[in-house]
Amino acid sequence: MSLKFDFSNLFEPNISGGLTDEDVKSVEEKVTSAVRNFVENTPDFAKLDRSWIDSVKSLEDWIINFDTVVVLGIGGSGLGNLALHYSLRPLNWNEMTREERNGYARVFVVDNVDPDLMSSVLDRIDPKTTLFNVISKSGSTAEVMATYSIARGILEAYGLDPREHMLITTDPEKGFLRKLVKEEGFRSLEVPPGVGGRFSVLTPVGLLSAMAEGIDIDELHEGAKDAFEKSMKENILENPAAMIALTHYLYLNKGKSISVMMAYSNRMIYLVDWYRQLWAESLGKRYNLKGEEVFTGQTPVKALGATDQHSQIQLYNEGPNDKVITFLRVENFDREIVIPETGRAELSYLARKKLSELLLAEQTGTEEALRENNRPNMRVTFDGLTPYNVGQFFAYYEAATAFMGYLLEINPFDQPGVELGKKITFALMGREGYTYEIKERSKKVIIE
């Protein structure tokens, strides 16, 4: 079954101040042009090259020997792997025995240089049965170079050959990591040159860890393929990605500068984190394609249902009406728990109901309350968390991001706003060729 998108609560008369047919007509031609551009100049991420799967599967006989895979990556290299792991494996996967995992690997993702995070992962692994997947497209990402150095040092301290416990995923031609592969003989996978990190989850960047923990990567690609095909339809009513872009573009022009994605499943929360990077880094731009200052973008916010009904929904219902809210809903959970009869009349309404019934009722109630308060919202329904459905989700939102970039007349595939911070970091850490002097603040406000 495909994902189902319900955009009804974004439109008049379902909410006051919602989108109208006239609003849609005003940008329909531009959206159609965005779709045609996507078809005629299909981005590499949407081509789903078969070699991506084949290159990963060529390592399967080697990978199956490891009890644990530790991904060392940040940004898209980390978030894509986390999204796959949490959405398509049980939440307690890494606590299961190898037998309970049917021989597949545990997967940990170190996506930060927080020493507590790195230590907590190292404390839980046996280097002798661990593979470190070092991922950096540039081959020089400071955070990944640091964690690579630590992991290599540990392997060498155990008397292990790093080449037998490390897999490097990087650019096919350039960068420090590719140089390492050529000089020292590490096994490697390629990050496609035309695919940016935040669009790379369906490439070897994400596929390796997915295969290692038993996720059907062919089914993942099949879902994405079908979604990309629908994303090439010019009829907006048959194209979920185009409708996502159209509605969010119109609402951005109406002052809705925040995009909330609220997942009603703990397993989907890293899908939301993945979306946050995709939407923020792709669309938050100072300049348009003409070089004019526009300072555009829509701030993505993460929420978890029902948890955040008790922290954020008050604001969403009665605070500034500056948000478009997307619900992620799962109809069928992998496991169920029935609430028992307690004998108390006050709790009888819960007796013999499934926990999932309560969770889905809370999603419906939250959605309806927002509609009553004229807060625009939409829903994406998964019949279950399967590789096919998750592949669709990735593809639809990647296509929607490309369409949104076209509508905003910006480049959704670069990220110039992150470069200065990187350069300053390199300078502070003493990297050759980088200098930066932090200026003394003329006014200081410091409280201890």
Swiss-Prot record:
Protein EC: 5.3.1.9
A Gene Ontology term for the protein's cellular component: cytosol
Main location: cytoplasm
Annotated GO MF terms: carbohydrate derivative binding; glucose-6-phosphate isomerase activity; monosaccharide binding
Pfam families (alphabetical): PGI
Outcome, altering K422A: 300-fold decrease in catalytic efficiency. Loss of activity
Enzyme class, UniProt record, top EC level: isomerase
An annotated GO BP: glycolytic process
Domain of life: Bacteria
Activity regulation, short description: Optimal activity is achieved when His-310 and Lys-422 are both present to open the sugar ring, and Glu-281 catalyzes the isomerization step. Activity is decreased in the presence of the PGI inhibitor 6-phosphogluconate.
Reactions accelerated catalytically: alpha-D-glucose 6-phosphate = beta-D-fructose 6-phosphate
InterPro entries: G6P_Isomerase, Phosphoglucose_isomerase_CS, SIS_dom_sf, SIS_PGI_1, SIS_PGI_2
Active site, renumbered: E281, H310, K422
Subcellular location: Cytoplasm
PANTHER family to which the protein is assigned, alphabetical: GLUCOSE-6-PHOSPHATE ISOMERASE
UniProt similarity note: Belongs to the GPI family.
Protein name (record): Glucose-6-phosphate isomerase
Organism of this sequence: Thermotoga maritima (strain ATCC 43589 / DSM 3109 / JCM 10099 / NBRC 100826 / MSB8)
